[in-house]
Curated annotation (Swiss-Prot):
Pathway: Purine metabolism; IMP biosynthesis via de novo pathway; 5-amino-1-(5-phospho-D-ribosyl)imidazole-4-carboxamide from 5-amino-1-(5-phospho-D-ribosyl)imidazole-4-carboxylate: step 1/2. This is Phosphoribosylaminoimidazole-succinocarboxamide synthase. It catalyses: 5-amino-1-(5-phospho-D-ribosyl)imidazole-4-carboxylate + L-aspartate + ATP = (2S)-2-[5-amino-1-(5-phospho-beta-D-ribosyl)imidazole-4-carboxamido]succinate + ADP + phosphate + 2 H(+). One of its GO terms (biological process) is cobalamin biosynthetic process. The lineage of its organism: Bacteria, Bacillati, Bacillota, Bacilli, Lactobacillales. Its EC number is 6.3.2.6. GO terms for molecular function: ATP binding; phosphoribosylaminoimidazolesuccinocarboxamide synthase activity. The keyword Amino-acid biosynthesis does not apply. HAMAP family: SAICAR_synth. It comes from Streptococcus pyogenes serotype M18 (strain MGAS8232). The keyword Zinc does not apply. Keywords: ATP-binding, Ligase, Nucleotide-binding, Purine biosynthesis. It is an enzyme of class 6 (ligase). Belongs to the SAICAR synthetase family.
Length: 234
C-alpha cells in the first residue's frame, strides 16, 4: 500500500511508496536521549538532519560506497532503497569521548592510535547492549565474513568522512552507522549520517553535534545549521 507508515522511530518515520523497493523517510523535529527517556521537540531539527545526511550520503555514493540513499525530495524527506536492517549499531571511535570514556575510565579527547570499531545490539528492551563478535555470531545476526565486511567498510567510510570534515575545520570524534541487506542480499549502508549519530568538535573543542542537547550546551539547531553551511561550502 502506498504511503503506509512502515516504521515509527524516535527521529524518523518511514512510509511505503508506489515502488515496493523504495521507502520515503521523514525526519522529525524531535531530539531524544537515554533511549528515548528524555524527549524534546526542536523546530527545524528534522530538516537540518535530512539535509546534512543527504549531502553526506551523496558524497559517499560518489566515492563508491554503496548506500540506500536515492534522493532528497523535500527539506525533511528523502527516498531510500528498502533494506532489511541488520540489528547492529556499528560504532567507530577516533577519539575517546562519551560512553567510551565512562566505560574505561579515560579522559575525553585522547586520540586513538588505531580507530576502534564496536558493535551494539539494536534492542530497545535491552537498551542496545555493547556486544562482541562472538555475541554477534551467537545471536545469528551476521556471520564471520559479514562481520569482517562491516568492520572494513566502516573503517573505509571513516577515512572518507574524516577527510571531508577536516576540510571544513571539524574533527570527527566518533560515529554510529547502520547497515542492511538490499533486495539482492548485499550489505549496504543505511539509516542516516548527521550530528545526531556522530560527534564533531571544532578546532576549539566546541561540540558541534547532539551533545549540545545531551549536555545542555546551547541551541541545537544553531549548531546544526553551522554544520550544514560548512558542508554546503565543501
Amino acid at each position: 500500500m502506498t504511503n503506509q507508515l512502515i516504521y515509527k522511530g524516535k527521529a524518523k518515520d518511514i512510509y511505503s511508496t508506489k515502488d515496493e523497493n523504495v521507502i520515503r523517510t521523514v525526519y522529525k523535529d524531535q531530539a531524544t536521549m537515554l533511549n528515548g527517556a528524555r524527549k524534546e521537540t526542536i523546530d527545524g531539527k528534522g530538516a537540518l538532519n535530512n539535509q546534512i545526511s543527504s549531502l553526506i550520503f551523496e558524497k559517499l555514493n560518489k566515492a563508491g560506497v554503496v548506500t540506500h540513499y536515492i534522493e532528497q525530495i523535500s527539506k525533511n524527506e528523502q527516498l531510500n532503497k528498502k533494506v532489511d536492517i541488520i540489528p547492529l549499531e556499528v560504532v567507530l571511535r577516533n577519539v575517546t569521548a562519551g560512553s567510551f570514556s565512562k566505560r574505561f575510565g579515560v579522559e575525553e579527547g585522547r586520540v586513538l592510535e588505531t580507530p576502534i570499531v564496536e558493535f551494539y545490539y539494536k534492542n530497545d528492551d535491552l537498551n542496545d547492549p555493547f556486544i562482541n563478535d562472538e555475541h554477534v555470531k551467537f545471536l545469528g545476526i551476521v556471520n564471520d565474513e559479514e562481520i569482517a565486511y562491516l568492520k572494513g567498510e566502516t573503517r573505509r567510510i571513516n577515512e572518507l568522512l574524516k577527510g571531508w570534515f577536516a576540510q571544513i575545520g571539524l574533527n570527527l570524534i566518533d560515529f554510529k552507522l547502520e547497515f542492511g541487506f538490499d533486495q539482492e542480499g548485499t550489505i549496504i549502508l543505511a539509516d542516516e549520517f548527521s550530528p545526531d549519530n556522530c560527534r564533531l568538535w571544532d578546532k576549539n573543542g566546541n561540540h558541534m553535534d547532539k551533545d549540545v542537547f545531551r549536555r545542555d550546551l546551547g541551541n541545537l539547531t544553531d549548531v546544526y545549521q553551522v554544520v550544514l553551511e560548512k558542508l554546503i561550502a565543501l
